[in-house]
């Protein structure tokens, strides 16, 4: 009696099942690769932001360094703090090597 209710599957059903499983796996792989791509892109933009901030800070530091080493600043500090002055020509003595 149990043979009456058993139907045989059409030919090619196993192949269709394999193709369906392959399709599902392919769809999951596409979704995962899209997710991973977005994660990497977010990480890239974050690193680019850090780089831009570091470059801006570097530019400010270079400008500050050039300000601190300017000749007019050094001369004014020497005159004001150390009371230095340019000697008169009569005060200059030549020393032989």
Curated annotation (Swiss-Prot):
<keyword id="KW-1003">Cell membrane</keyword>
<dbReference type="GO" id="GO:0005886">
    <property type="term" value="C:plasma membrane"/>
</dbReference>
<dbReference type="InterPro" id="IPR011922">
    <property type="entry name" value="Cell_div_FtsL"/>
</dbReference>
<keyword id="KW-0997">Cell inner membrane</keyword>
<feature type="topological domain" description="Cytoplasmic">
    <location>
        <begin position="1"/>
        <end position="11"/>
    </location>
</feature>
<feature type="transmembrane region" description="Helical">
    <location>
        <begin position="12"/>
        <end position="32"/>
    </location>
</feature>
<comment type="subunit">
    <text>Part of a complex composed of FtsB, FtsL and FtsQ.</text>
</comment>
<keyword id="KW-0472">Membrane</keyword>
<feature type="topological domain" description="Periplasmic">
    <location>
        <begin position="33"/>
        <end position="97"/>
    </location>
</feature>
<keyword id="KW-0131">Cell cycle</keyword>
<comment type="function">
    <text>Essential cell division protein. May link together the upstream cell division proteins, which are predominantly cytoplasmic, with the downstream cell division proteins, which are predominantly periplasmic.</text>
</comment>
<keyword id="KW-0812">Transmembrane</keyword>
<keyword id="KW-1133">Transmembrane helix</keyword>
<protein>
    <recommendedName>
        <fullName>Cell division protein FtsL</fullName>
    </recommendedName>
</protein>
<dbReference type="Pfam" id="PF04999">
    <property type="entry name" value="FtsL"/>
</dbReference>
<dbReference type="GO" id="GO:0032153">
    <property type="term" value="C:cell division site"/>
</dbReference>
<comment type="similarity">
    <text>Belongs to the FtsL family.</text>
</comment>
<keyword id="KW-0132">Cell division</keyword>
<dbReference type="GO" id="GO:0043093">
    <property type="term" value="P:FtsZ-dependent cytokinesis"/>
</dbReference>
């Amino acid at each position: 009696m149990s043979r009456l209710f058993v139907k045989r599957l059409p030919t090619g059903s196993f192949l269709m099942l394999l193709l369906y499983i392959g399709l599902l796996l392919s769809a999951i792989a596409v979704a995962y690769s899209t997710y991973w791509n977005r994660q990497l892109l977010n990480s890239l933009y974050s690193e680019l932001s850090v780089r831009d901030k570091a470059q801006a800070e570097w530019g400010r530091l270079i400008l500050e360094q050039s300000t601190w080493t300017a000749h007019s600043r050094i001369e004014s500090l020497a005159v004001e703090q150390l009371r230095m002055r340019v000697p008169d020509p009569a005060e200059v003595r030549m020393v032989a090597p």
